[in-house]
Amino acid sequence: FNQDALLECARAGTLAFGENYAQEGCTKIDWFRTNHPELHLEWHFIGPLQANKSRMVAERFDWVQTVDRLRIAERLSAQRPDNLPPLNVLIEVNVDAEASKSGISPEELPALAAAVSKLPRLRLRGLMSIPAPAETYEGKMKPLLAMASLFKAFQEKYPQADTLSMGMSADLTEAVE
């Protein structure tokens, strides 16, 4: 969506927005902060993050939902300005082991979470996953339930974790269940 559409949404009460592309998101964030500083919007980066774009994301976004490598987490922490609160992050889990998707395997989660939780300018808030598309209710629910179970175990180790972000429009109803 362009800035005008987002402005209309913000005036209607939507205050959190997700962006897939770092440059496009940063342009929108800068525009809002310059032209509408009265709006206190929350910006989530939800796309794959390349190392060469980490600084712009660390300097502008409030959340990164796609942390899947320690190198990216370390860069985000090092590049987060001291005058901003710690960057909220979610670790992306590839629950269906899809070759075409980003994210770590559930087995890799403990090691990455332990390392991310120690980074000073990041706040580990939880997990994110985009399950494989499925036609049936059961097919949609299987990876969502696996993620819910993984998140429950994750919260035992990280009680501050309060966010589980899952699914897309096609499985929204099932993800909310």
How would you label these PLM feature ranges?
Residues 1-170:
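Conserved alpha/beta-domain cores
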Residues 169-177:
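Acidic, divalent-metal-coordinating active-site segment for phosphoryl/phosphodiester hydrolysis
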